[in-house]
């Protein structure tokens, strides 16, 4: 390594030090999904980021999705995907596949990636330690012609109703990094598939996490000129939804951020998971890497 390279590395570490101190012993929940999950190099970079957070004294918790992988497995098993109002209907056969893919193959792949860095990850879902309980989701859709709302029956799609932080508190005191699949039981004995974003928000809220990071396929919230908005308050986010600046699929993402803040999360960040080491850039640099939403 040349002298110039050594000086550059030393400078970068010196700049990162205040942020490492700021987040020491703090909980950061990272929702991992999107393009990064299907890219081997980005997956390794993500695992390295999570490992470095742990090594820096942070308490990282990973929550992951897996929609495309679920769809691929359903096709492979010859099970037709059904949709109501654009939302997947999860019948008994489908929820069994969902649990197999999310809590099985995907979860263990992420655990293995983190373990390869030398850290110690453990794979979980909402069933473990009675961590999360869910109930059947109640979704409605409005007919554009009649303006009449009707209730959608999405089967075993659930909403989080209770989070018990006991297991996560125990893991925070250990060397383990929890990797959690968004599958949870109901008090009725059923198994429910839960939207990974809202699941991550519920976990982060229950832990009063310092940060909740959503890794997406976009840089963050953009203004009407297509430029990244670095920071928004909840009130500003509501205003941008009202005036159409925030639209389409970004609306439910931002609404989930707002719900998480109301639940006790100190700040939520939407950032681009397609950028290698975006987690480290967000946490350990002055300007971050996405859009920070705060109370």
From Swiss-Prot:
HAMAP family: ArgB. The gene is argB. It holds the Pfam family AA_kinase. Its EC number is 2.7.2.8. PANTHER family: N-ACETYLGLUTAMATE SYNTHASE, N-ACETYLGLUTAMATE SYNTHASE, MITOCHONDRIAL. Pathway: Amino-acid biosynthesis; L-arginine biosynthesis; N(2)-acetyl-L-ornithine from L-glutamate: step 2/4. Keywords: Amino-acid biosynthesis, Arginine biosynthesis, ATP-binding, Cytoplasm, Kinase, Nucleotide-binding, Transferase. GO terms for biological process: arginine biosynthetic process via ornithine; L-arginine biosynthetic process. It is found in: Cytoplasm. GO terms for molecular function: acetylglutamate kinase activity; ATP binding. It comes from Rhizobium rhizogenes (strain K84 / ATCC BAA-868) (Agrobacterium radiobacter). The record marks 31, 253 as: Transition state stabilizer. Belongs to the acetylglutamate kinase family. ArgB subfamily. GO terms for cellular component: cytoplasm. It catalyses: N-acetyl-L-glutamate + ATP = N-acetyl-L-glutamyl 5-phosphate + ADP. Its main location: cytoplasm. This is Acetylglutamate kinase. Substrate binds at residues 66-67, 88, 193. Catalyzes the ATP-dependent phosphorylation of N-acetyl-L-glutamate.
